[in-house]
């Protein structure tokens, strides 16, 4: 087996010398490329594109983070994930009473991750929501070119859906060089 690097489709268009969007591709004994693993595809920096929440009991969708959320998730080759997402139209708190509202448009944690099948599983070590610390959480992910679509399991989120079961549908775009 050999190890080569291959860029995702369209990832290096116009940036032939870039290595920001490459992931390892192993070759079989006959020299044919094998598909990259999900972990190979995840490693790197991803920008938040959209964050929608589906309520289980009603089937309605909430644009929980607003029309133009921002944030990043970073996966390292050695198994760390850092996740920081913010909703649209956030402004600095002017009073103590403003802080709880800001927490409703924030998701942030750091931990170790591993990949099993089509899921990444993280052991949360620090988080914006203390009840997440020490938990193991699963996310289903589909990577297509430079886009990653993530679906959470049904659960009760601390910051929306008023304690009802919901799941998040999150889209990321692989970050460009220097982004």
Regions found by a protein language model. Give the residues of each.
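Lipid interaction determinants
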Residues: 23-110, 115-179
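N-terminal amphipathic/basic-hydrophobic helices that include classical n-h-c signal peptides
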Residues: 1-29
């Amino acid at each position: 087996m050999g190890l080569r690097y291959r860029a995702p489709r369209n990832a290096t268009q116009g940036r032939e010398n870039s290595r920001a969007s490459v992931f390892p591709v192993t070759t079989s004994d006959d020299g044919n490329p094998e598909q990259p693993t999900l972990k190979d595809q995840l490693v790197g920096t991803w920008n938040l594109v959209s964050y929608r929440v589906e309520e289980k009991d009603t089937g309605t969708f909430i644009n929980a983070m607003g029309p133009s959320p921002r944030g990043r998730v970073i996966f390292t080759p050695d198994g760390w994930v850092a996740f920081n997402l913010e909703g649209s139209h956030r402004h600095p708190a002017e009073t103590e009473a403003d802080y709880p509202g800001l927490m409703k448009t924030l998701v942030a944690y750091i931990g170790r991750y591993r990949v099993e099948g089509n899921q990444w599983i993280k052991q949360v070590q620090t988080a914006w929501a203390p009840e997440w610390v020490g938990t193991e959480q699963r996310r289903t992910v589909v990577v297509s070119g430079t886009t990653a679509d993530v679906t959470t399991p049904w659960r009760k989120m601390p910051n929306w859906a008023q304690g009802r079961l919901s799941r998040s549908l999150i889209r990321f775009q692989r970050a460009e060089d220097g982004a």
